[in-house]
């Protein structure tokens, strides 16, 4: 598909499918795909749990803010962000000013199902991950909505179904940029 859209940024909670759907969207549009968490790991030579352990969440968020400033300035990319990206005002500013932001909205039940076996999520290494996910959702959902140009309810949908919903929304909201 041909498009003259600016860069596309995907936000949402952990387990929403940002990376999976982002890769599909990038392929569909013929664009490069970048995952900000993977980018941070490549830049530091360490994984996210290690960064959290050594630098704490504050250290990670500082690294994330630098990465988001750099990555949102790139042209014609699809960028999947980390779940906490919206916690920093400068990240929200970069997301809203540099491209089109798509919020993949997943409820806590969906997130819990998709993250249950994933041990690489430091914020879920707790006896009650449901409570953590609910707390994060309550704080972050309004911030995701604040930056979002498009909101896609993921439900229990498959990645290709979510891709279809995103493409339909892009055609509806930005028809001048979308050509079949």
Curated annotation (Swiss-Prot):
Cellular compartments per GO CC: cytosol
Q: Which residues bind ATP?
A: 15-20, 121
The entry marks the following residues as binding substrate, namely: 37, 61, 83, 140
The cofactor required is:
Mg(2+)
One molecular function GO term is: ATP binding
Is the keyword Zinc assigned to this protein?
Answer: no
Q: Which domain of life is it from?
A: Bacteria
Q: Which reaction does it catalyse?
A: shikimate + ATP = 3-phosphoshikimate + ADP + H(+)
Entry keyword DNA-binding: no
Q: What is its main location?
A: cytoplasm
Q: Which InterPro entries match?
A: P-loop_NTPase (IPR027417), Shikimate/glucono_kinase (IPR031322), Shikimate_kinase/TSH1 (IPR000623), Shikimate_kinase_CS (IPR023000)
| Assembly and binders | Monomer.
Give the protein name, as stated in the record.
Answer: Shikimate kinase
Organism annotation = Psychrobacter sp. (strain PRwf-1)
